C-alpha cells in the first residue's frame, strides 16, 4: 500500500503499451502514497489563478529513460539495451556533440528533472500512466496526480489579461491559431490574453546541432526569456527533452508564474490539427474553424518516429 510495496510487487502488475489489447482486470493494486485527485479541475484552476501551477507532464520516452537510469527494470521498447538515450535523441531532441560528455549530460538532465518532479504538481497523459506511476514510486513521491489533458481548457478559460509565452518549435502554427481567434476554435468562453513566442531548435537525430549540447541550448533560451519575455504570466511548453530543465530553471528564476508543459496539446489549445493529431476527440471543438499545422517536416527529420508535428 505504499511506494516500496508497489515496486516490490511490480512483476505482478500487468503493463500495456500503445498497441496492447485491453487487459482483463484481475487483482487490484493500491498505492496510497500516490493517488489520483478526485477534484481535478477545481484544484488545478485554483492553482492557476494563484499563479502557482507548475507541471512538466513527463513524456513516455523521458519516463522510460529515467527508469532505466535509476536501474528500474521495466520492459519497454523506449530505450536500447546498450544505448539507453537513443529515443531521447531520436524522439525528444536530447543531444550532445561530444560523446565523452554523454554521462555528464545524462546526470545533468536527470538531476534537473527529478528536482522538478519532486516539487511540481504531477500530471500524466493517462495513455502512458503505467510508466509514470512506476517512475513516481521509484522517486518515493507522496502526492496527488492529475490528468494533463484537462489543463489546456483550464488555461483557455482562466487567462483573462494574462501574457502567455509559448516555448516550442511550432511558432508559425501557434501564432496563426492565435491570430485567427482562439475563441473561434471552441464552443466555450475563451479568455482574452496576449502572446509571446520563443522558437526552440529541432535537434532530434539527423538534424544539425546548434550548440555543444542541449544544456548550452537551454542556457541560451533562458537568457532570451530573461532579456525579452520576463513579464510573462504563464509559460506553455512543447519542446521535448528541453521541457524539464527549462521549467526547473524558470520556476526558480521567476516567482508567481504558471509554467506548464503541454507538448502536443499546445496545438490543440490553439485549434491546430495534423494527420497524427486530429481534433475529433474534442466535443468542445468547432471543427470547421481548426487549421492544419503549417510547419513542413524539417531537414533531417525524414525518419523521425513522430511525424505528427508537421504537414
Regions flagged by a language model, labelled:
Residues 1-194:
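Electropositive, gly/pro-rich neighborhoods at or near active sites that engage anionic ligands
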Residues 163, 233-234:
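Structural motif
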Residues 242-311:
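C-terminal functional extensions of proteins
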Residues 39-40, 107-109, 216-228, 243-244:
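A short, acidic, amphipathic alpha-helical segment used as a generic capping/interface helix at domain edges
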Residues 134-141, 196-223:
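Glycine-rich phosphate-binding "P-loop"
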Residues 234-241:
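N-terminal glycine-rich "phosphate-gripper" loop used for MgATP/nucleotide binding
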Residues 83-88, 193-202, 260-266:
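A generic structural motif
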Amino acid at each position: 500500500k505504499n511506494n516500496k510495496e508497489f515496486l516490490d510487487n511490480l512483476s505482478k502488475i500487468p503493463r500495456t503499451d500503445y498497441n496492447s489489447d485491453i487487459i482483463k482486470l484481475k487483482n487490484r493494486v493500491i498505492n496510497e502514497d500516490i493517488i489520483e485527485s478526485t477534484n481535478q479541475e477545481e484544484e488545478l484552476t485554483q492553482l492557476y489563478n494563484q499563479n502557482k501551477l507548475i507541471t512538466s507532464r513527463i513524456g513516455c520516452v523521458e519516463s522510460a529513460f529515467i527508469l532505466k537510469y535509476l536501474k528500474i527494470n521495466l520492459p519497454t521498447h523506449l530505450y536500447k539495451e546498450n544505448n539507453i538515450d537513443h529515443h531521447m535523441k531520436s524522439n525528444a531532441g536530447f543531444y550532445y556533440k561530444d560523446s565523452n560528455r554523454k554521462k555528464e549530460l545524462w546526470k545533468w538532465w536527470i538531476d534537473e528533472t527529478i528536482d522538478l518532479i519532486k516539487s511540481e504538481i504531477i500530471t500524466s497523459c493517462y495513455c502512458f500512466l503505467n510508466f509514470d506511476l512506476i517512475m513516481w514510486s521509484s522517486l518515493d513521491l507522496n502526492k496527488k496526480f492529475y490528468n494533463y489533458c484537462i489543463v489546456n481548457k483550464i488555461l483557455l478559460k482562466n487567462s483573462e489579461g494574462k501574457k502567455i509565452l509559448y516555448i516550442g518549435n511550432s511558432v508559425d502554427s501557434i501564432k496563426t491559431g492565435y491570430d485567427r481567434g482562439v475563441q473561434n476554435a471552441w464552443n466555450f468562453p475563451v479568455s482574452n490574453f496576449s502572446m509571446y513566442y520563443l522558437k526552440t531548435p529541432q535537434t532530434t537525430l539527423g538534424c544539425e546541432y546548434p550548440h555543444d549540447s542541449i544544456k548550452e541550448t537551454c542556457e541560451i533560451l533562458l537568457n532570451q526569456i530573461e532579456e525579452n519575455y520576463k513579464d510573462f504570466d504563464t509559460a506553455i511548453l512543447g519542446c521535448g527533452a528541453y521541457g524539464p530543465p527549462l521549467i526547473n530553471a524558470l520556476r526558480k528564476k521567476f516567482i508567481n508564474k504558471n509554467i506548464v508543459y503541454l507538448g502536443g496539446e499546445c496545438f490543440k489549445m490553439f485549434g491546430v490539427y495534423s494527420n497524427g493529431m486530429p481534433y475529433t476527440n474534442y466535443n468542445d471543438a468547432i471543427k470547421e474553424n481548426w487549421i492544419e499545422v503549417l510547419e513542413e517536416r524539417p531537414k533531417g527529420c525524414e525518419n523521425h518516429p513522430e511525424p505528427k508535428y508537421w504537414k
